Amino acid sequence: MAAVVVLAIVGLLPLCLMVGSSLWVDGSLSSRNYVEVLGNARTWILFRNSLVLATLTTAVAGLAGVSLGILVARTDLPFSSSIAVVFSLPLLFPPYILAVGWFEILGRGGILARWIPIGETTSRWLFGLPGAVLVLGSAFLPIVLLLTITYLRGMNPSLEQAARLSAGWPAVLRRITIPLITPGILLSLVLVFLLSMGEFGAPAFLRIDVFPVASFTQSSAFYNFGAATAAAMPLIAVVLAGLLMIQRILHGRAYSFRWGGQSTLERIPLGRKKPIVLLAVVVLAAILVGVPLAGVLWRGSSVAALSDALQRAGESAIRSFVYAGLSATFLSVLGFFVAYLVYRRSVAGWWSVDALALFLFTLPGTVLGIGLIALWNHPSTNWIYATPAMLMIGFVAQYAALSSRIVLAGFSQMSPSLEEAAEVAGAGWFRRVFGILTPLVRPALLASWAVTFVFCLRDVALPLLLASPGRDTLTARTMTLMANGSSELIAALCLLAVLLALLPLGAIGIAWRLWRTPA
Amino acid sequence: MSAIELQKVWKTYGGRSVVSHLSFRIEKGERVTIHGPSGSGKTTVLRMLAGFLAPDEGVVLIGGQEVAANGKIHVGPEHRNLGMVFQDLALWPHLTVYQNLEFALKAQGLTADVRRQRIGEVLARVRLDEFSGTYPARLSGGQQQRVAIARALVAQPLALLMDEPLSNLDDDLKDELCTHLLDLHAQLGFTLVYVTHSKEEMRKIGNRAILLKDAKGVSV
Amino acid sequence: MGQEGSQQLAAGFPVARRTVNRSCWIVLSLAALVGCGTGRPNAVTVYVSEDQIFSESILKDFKRETGIKVNAVFDTEEAKSTGVMNRLLAEKNNPQADVYWANEPVRADVLRQQGISTPYKPVSAAEIPDRFKDQQGYWTGFSARARLLVVNKAASIKPASALAYVDPKTKGKGVIANPLFGTTTAQMAALFTLWGDEKGKQFLAGLKNNKVKLSTSNGESADFVASGEFEFALVDSDDAVDRVRHGKPLEIVYPDQGEGEVGVLILPNAVALIRGGPNAENGKKLIEYLVSKETERKLAFADCAQIPLHPGVATPKEIKPIEQTKTMNVNYADLGAKLQAIQPILKEWVGY
C-alpha cells in the first residue's frame, strides 16, 4: 500500500497540480492558457516536428533493432552476445553524448572535414532531421533489440518447431516467429516513440525545434507556468494514447511464455551468407556505436582535457554516482512492492499503479520536473525541496516503471505456489516477503538496480530542473558547459560519463558471476 | 524399405550420453511407442527424427533416404514429410484453427481450393468442422489435442510423431483420444511413433514398443 | 500569473497540501539518507545564464575572497536562459535563489515585470552609465557584448554599417545568424525599436532581396567570413575576438559610428536581487562583486572578451573601451517588449 502512496505522491500529485494551475488564470477557472497555446500555429508546427522525428526514429530503431534481435537471438551468427552488448552500449549514457561524438566526426571542424572538404554539408546534415534520427535511432535501438531478444528467448520453442516441420525458415519467421513476438516488438516501438517524443538533450544539442525543448524555450510557453503546462498537453495526450496501446498490446492477447529453463531453440543456420551478414552487422555497429564513441574518445582522451574535466566536474561526477545509486536502491525497493502488488493483484486497482508508473516513465522529464517544483517548492517543505532528495524524488517518479517491470518479470518466472507453500507453513507476510520472495527474485532486483542506476545516471532533463543549487550532476554540468566550452572539454566530460556508467556495471557483472558460481 | 531407421546413433549433451549406440527400424504403417523413464532420451530421439537435432554419430534414415548423419543434417525438417504433435501441443495462438492447419499446406504451395478441401476433410475426421474459425485458446483441452493431431495429419505425412501428447489430460479424455487416434490410424494408415512414459498408453497404442534404458534401446 | 493568483492556486488545492504533510514521513527516510543540506549560514545561491565556462571562475574568486560559499545553478546553451528562468518563475512563491546573473538585460527585466526581483542599487556600479541599469534598481548591467561587424581582410568592400546588408553592392556577400534566436533577435528588435516597424520590415525584405545567407549561429557566421565564403557578418564581440585571436583573416569593425548613425548595440550582463531570497545580504555582496571594475576587467581579458561598462577599465587590444564607442540608444525594457512583438514577423520572414 505504501508503494501506491509513494508513487502517487511523487508522480501523480505534481501532475494534478500542474493541470489544475494551468486552468486557473487570474483567480478563476479558465481555459485561456489552452486556447492561447493550442490555438498557436507554432505549437502545432513543433508538435508535427516532434511527431516526424519520433516516427522516423521509431522506424529506424525498429527496423534495425528487430532485424538485429533476430540475428542475435535466433541465428548461428558468431559473437552474437558481444554484438548485442555493443549495440546496447548507447543505453548507458545520454543520447546527446552520441550527438557530441557525431559532431566531432561530422562537424565543420570535425575529423572528416580535415580530410575531405565536406564539413559544411555533413554539419548541416547532422544539425537537422537526419542527424537527430541517426542519434536517437542508435540511442533507442537497444530498447527494441533487447525486448526482441527477450521475447524471442521467452518464446515456446515448440511453436517454431511445429512450423519448421512444414516450412523453411523465411516462412516460419514471417508467419510464426515475428507474429508471435509482435507484442514485444510493438511494446518496444511504442516505448521508443514516446521516449523520442520526450527526449530533451540530443535534439537540444542538434538544434532541432521539437516539442519538449521548444515548449519550454519559446515564447509561447515562456514566462507563464500555466501555458507551459497547456503546451505540454498534446505531449501528454500522445503519451496517454501510447499507454493505451501498450495496455492493449499486453493485455489483449495472452501468450504462453516459457521463461528460463534449458533453451532448446534451434538456431537458424546462415550458411554461406554468414561472413557477409557478420560483416554487415560489424559495419553497422561501427557506424552506429563505434564512430560516435570514437569521436568522443578522440577529442576527450588527452590528459589536459581529462584533468580539466575532472577539475571542473569531478564533484558533479561523484554526486551523479551517489544520487543514481541511492535512487536505484530506493527504486528497487519500490519496484519490488509495486511488482508484488501487480503480481498478486491483491489490491483493487492494481493495474492503475502499473499504468501510472508507465505513464510517468514516458512523460518528458521537463514536464515532470516543473510539476515537482510546483508541488514541493513551499516554505513548509523546504527541508526537502532545497536538498538533493528533490532530484531523487524526480528519478523515483520517472523510473518506477522500469524497476517494477523488471522485478515483475522476476516474479512471473516464479511459481505462485512457492509463496503459498510458505503461507501454509505459517510464515507471516513479513517472513514470506523477506525470507522467500526476496531471495527468489534477487537476480531481478539486481537487474532492476543496474538498469535504474544507469537511467538515473544518464538523465539530463530532471537534474537541469531539480538539482539543488551548487549540487548539479555530471550530465547537467556537461550540458551547461557546452555553452562556449571547448569541444575537448565536452568530449572529456562525455568520456567521464561513459566511464561512470561502465565502472559499476562492470562491478555488478563480476558480483553476478561470484553470486551465481556457488549456485 | 523401412519408414524410419536409426543406425548406431549417439547423442551427447555436455559430456553426458543421452542416446548411445541406438538402432531400430520402424516399418510403414506400424504403431510404435518409444518408452522409458524420464531422462532416457525419448524426446531427443524424436527430435532427431523430426530434424531439429543431428546425431553426433550414426545415421538417421527416413523413407530409405539418409536425412542426417555424424553431426550433419542433410534434409531439414520441412523436407522430411513428417507430422508431429508436441507435448504442449504448440498450437499457434495468433492463428485460427483453420489457419493453423493451412500453414503446412501453404508451404507446399497448394491452391486455396485444394487447401480448403483438405482442411475440411481432416477437420471432419477429428470432428471439429464447426471450430475452423476459432482461436485455439477458446477450445477445451480435448479439442486442442484434436486440432494438434489434425494439424500434424493435414499434410498427409509419411509418419506421425507424438511426444507424450496425453500427459496433461484426465483419464476419461485420455481414453477417448486414444480410441480416436486408433480410429484415425485405421482409416489413414500412417506410421505412428508415439513417445510416452505411461505403460498403459504403451499397451493401448503400440503394436510394438521400443524401450529406452541407460541411453540404449531395447525393442520389445 | 500574479502573486494573488498563485496564493489562490495553492488554496485551491487543499488536498494536495494535506497529503504532502501526511506523506512527510515517507520522504523523511530519503532526506535522512541524503542529509539535510539547507541553512548553510554563510552561503549565497545564484542562478546563472552567463556561460558557465566564464562565470564559474568569477564565482570561485568571490568565494575565495569573501569566504561565502556559492551555490550556483547554470543554464544550458540550447535552452538559453530558459532553464533557470523557468526555475525562477516556478519558485516564485518560495525563492531558492538570491541572485540572478543574466547574460542580457531583457530577461532580467522580465523578472522585474513578474515581481520576482527586488530593487538594489550596488555602490560599486555607481560609475556605470545609467542607460545600462534599470532606473529603479531592479537590475544592473555590467560587462557587455557588442554586436560588431567582422569583415574578411580580402573583402572588396569594407562595410561600416548594418545597412551594408541591404546595399545592392554587397549582394550575396553578407551572412547573418538566424534572427529567430539569441542576440540576432535582440539586434532585430533594437532596429525595429529605433526605426519603427515599417522601416524594420523593409530592412528584412532588403536582406532577402540582397541574398543574405542565414547561418545557425554567430560563431558559424564568423567562420563563414573567416573562410572567405562570405565577406562580412554582424556577430557578437566574443565570436569576433575569438576568431581574431586565432589568427583568422578578419577585421573587426564597429558599425554605425558616424554622425546620425544608430551606433553599436550593447548587450550587457545584468544582475538582479531576488525578492525574498534566503540570503539577501550575501546576495547583495555578490552583486557588488559582480558589477565591480575588477570583475569587468577579468571578463574583458577572459576568452569572452566582454566590454567593461565602467569607464577606464583596461581592455584587451581587440576591443574598444566603452567611452570611445557610440552605442545604440535603446531602453532594454522596450527592447524586451519589441522582441516579443516582432516574433511573428521574424517567423514569417524565416519561413516557419
For each feature predicted by the language model, list its residue ranges.
Chain A
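Membrane-water interface segments at the C-terminal ends of transmembrane alpha-helices
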Residues: 1-27, 39-153, 180-201, 228-247, ...
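Amphipathic alpha-helical segments in well-structured domains
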Residues: 31, 44, 86, 159, ...
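Short coil/turn motifs that cap or connect alpha-helices
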Residues: 78, 168-169, 417, 427-428
